[in-house]
UniProtKB/Swiss-Prot annotation:
PANTHER family tied to this protein: BIFUNCTIONAL 3-DEHYDROQUINATE DEHYDRATASE_SHIKIMATE DEHYDROGENASE, CHLOROPLASTIC (PTHR21089:SF1), SHIKIMATE DEHYDROGENASE (PTHR21089)
Pathway: Metabolic intermediate biosynthesis; chorismate biosynthesis; chorismate from D-erythrose 4-phosphate and phosphoenolpyruvate: step 4/7
InterPro entries: Aminoacid_DH-like_N_sf, NAD(P)-bd_dom_sf, Shikimate_DH-bd_N, Shikimate_DH_fam, Shikm_DH/Glu-tRNA_Rdtase
Keywords recorded for this protein, A-Z: Amino-acid biosynthesis, Aromatic amino acid biosynthesis, NADP, Oxidoreductase
Active site residues of this protein: K71
EC number(s) per entry: 1.1.1.25
Name listed for the protein in its UniProt record: Shikimate dehydrogenase
Keyword Membrane tagged: no
Pfam family of the protein (one): Shikimate_DH
Residues the record lists as binding NADP(+): G124, A125, G126, G127, A128
Reaction catalyzed: shikimate + NADP(+) = 3-dehydroshikimate + NADPH + H(+)
Length: 260
C-alpha cells in the first residue's frame, strides 16, 4: 500500500470521459513493484475547461499521459520531441517536453513480431490511425487506408502528404499487415484477414473477433492490450528510466479481472 508523503511524485492521465481508463491501475502497480514513490491519477477534464486547467497540471505534475481528445491540442503547451513533433500529437509529458509512446509501442511490437513486410492496410482514418501510419511508414511499409467516410480518408491523405508520407485509399485489402484502428473489430471483413500480421487497437475483450479470426488462420497478431501496456512502459522509461516487463503488467490486469 502506497504511503503518500512529502516526496511522493504526482503523475496522471489527462482526457475527457475517461472513467474506463486502465492507466492508473497499470502505473500504480508498476510504481509499487519498482519501489517508486509516486501516485498516478486520472484527470477527467471537460473540453471547455481544458485551457484553464491543463497548463497548471503540466507545471505541478512530475509526468503526464494524454489521451482522447487532447493528444493534438496538448502539443501546443510543451516542447514536442522528434516523432511527436512529426506526428503532431503527444501522449506523454516530462519536464515540459512532449513524446509519443504510441508510435514507439507500435513500431517496436511490429519489429518483434515479423521481420519482412512491404504493404499495410489500415482500417479507419481517425486519431488512432496516426501513430500506426508514422510507425509503419518509418519501417518502409507502403500504406493503404480503408474508411467508411471517403471525405475523412481524403483529409488524412492530404495531411500525411504535407508530412511527406504517401498513403492511398483502397478497396483491395491484401497486405502483409492489417490494422484495425476503429472501435469495431468486425469492420474488417473476413476476406481482409490475411497476410503476416493483424493488429487490433481494441482491448476489451483482449481477444477480439478480429484477433480470433486471425489466430484461426495462423496469422500473427498484436492485440490492443499489448499496445496499451507497451506505450505505458515506454512512458515510465521516460519518467524514471525503468519499467516492468510488459508480461508482468498484463498478468496483473488479468489477475485483477480488469481485462478478459
Amino acid at each position: 500500500m502506497l504511503e503518500i508523503n512529502y516526496d511522493t511524485k504526482l503523475l496522471g492521465v489527462v482526457g475527457e470521459n475517461i472513467s474506463y481508463t486502465l492507466s492508473p491501475a497499470i502505473h500504480n502497480y508498476s510504481f509499487q513493484e519498482l519501489g517508486i514513490n509516486a501516485v498516478y491519477l486520472a484527470f477527467d477534464i471537460k473540453s471547455d475547461e481544458f485551457k484553464e486547467i491543463f497548463p497548471g497540471l503540466v507545471k505541478i505534475a512530475y509526468g503526464l499521459n494524454i489521451t482522447i481528445p487532447y493528444k493534438e491540442i496538448a502539443i501546443k503547451y510543451v516542447e514536442a520531441q522528434s516523432e511527436a513533433k512529426r506526428i503532431g500529437a503527444i501522449n506523454t509529458i516530462f519536464n515540459g517536453k512532449g513524446y509519443n509512446t504510441d508510435y514507439i509501442a507500435i513500431k517496436s511490437l511490429v519489429q518483434e513480431r515479423i521481420d519482412k513486410f512491404e504493404t499495410c492496410t489500415i482500417f479507419g482514418a481517425g486519431g488512432a490511425a496516426r501513430a500506426a501510419i508514422f510507425a509503419l511508414h518509418d519501417l518502409d511499409c507502403s500504406i493503404n487506408v480503408i474508411n467508411r467516410s471517403k471525405e475523412k480518408a481524403e483529409k488524412l491523405i492530404e495531411e500525411m502528404r504535407n508530412k511527406n508520407i504517401e498513403i492511398k485509399i483502397t478497396y483491395n485489402c491484401k497486405s502483409d499487415i492489417i490494422v484495425n484502428s476503429t472501435p469495431n473489430p468486425d469492420f474488417v471483413p473476413d476476406e481482409c484477414v490475411n497476410g503476416k500480421l493483424v493488429i487490433d487497437f481494441v482491448y476489451k475483450p483482449v481477444i477480439t473477433s478480429l484477433i480470433k479470426r486471425a489466430q484461426n488462420k495462423n496469422i500473427k497478431t498484436i492485440n490492443g492490450i499489448e499496445i496499451l501496456v507497451r506505450q505505458a512502459m515506454e512512458a515510465e522509461k521516460i519518467w524514471f528510466g525503468k519499467s516492468l516487463e510488459d508480461e508482468e503488467v498484463v498478468n496483473y490486469l488479468y489477475a485483477r479481472k480488469l481485462i478478459w
